[in-house]
Amino acid sequence: DNVKWNASADWRTIYPYVLADTLGGDRNTERYTFQGGCATRLGHWTIGEELTFRAEHEWATHDPRMRAIVTDLNARIGVGRTLLHHHFALGGTLSLYKQTNSVEFYREEGKIPEYQMMGLGNWYERFSGTNNSAYYKAVGGGMDVGGRPSAGRGGLLFSASYNYTPYKRILSSLNALPITQLYVTQWQGRLGWKVRM
């Protein structure tokens, strides 16, 4: 993401609660993903499942040597049915997220402080300086509902979704002390009318 003052991976996910320093530097990234799913028809009902997984490793080869490992797992299940010339669906999502990150210094000149950022340019003074490792974890979930007219028919189409994920930042060097929690809530909705063709 080329973001200064950041020694954590997934900046867009955990911002503003990142580990940071004044030097920064170039990073290397490895990312592995897989995704799979299936759908089964049972009479008028359709049941679908999907699983996505992402593993990421980010590191620097010069001081400060940040290293972050991310695992991100999402499981979805949904059920759908055709009723009154419309297709209706209801789904649910479970999300599991973990990131471990740390910064090491190997040069003889010594270390610089690492800052536990709090947003708007502020940092957590009590836990900054020598606490150069943290991990993030989250268990979230969501649900969505939708409907649309059958093929060749007109009518109302709609969708709505809600997702909630609380990300905790935990200092492993202080007996797994949680120092921040980021609550991410997303609402989405769409409403429309399909003209019959």
Segments and roles (model prediction):
Residues 28-34, 64-73, 137-143, 183-189:
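Residues that define the transmembrane beta-barrel architecture of outer-membrane proteins
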Residues 34-40, 75-81, 143-151, 189-197:
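Residues on the lipid-exposed face of transmembrane beta-strands in outer-membrane beta-barrel proteins
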Residues 48-54, 89-95, 146, 157-165, ...:
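Transmembrane beta-strands of outer-membrane beta-barrel proteins
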Residues 4-19, 109-127:
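Surface-exposed loop/turn segments flanking beta-strands in extracellular/periplasmic regions
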Residues 18-24, 59-65, 129-134, 171-181:
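Extracellular loop and loop/strand-boundary signature of outer-membrane beta-barrel proteins
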Residues 2-9, 59-66, 101-108, 168-177:
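Outer-membrane beta-barrel translocator domains and adjoining extracellular loop/strand segments
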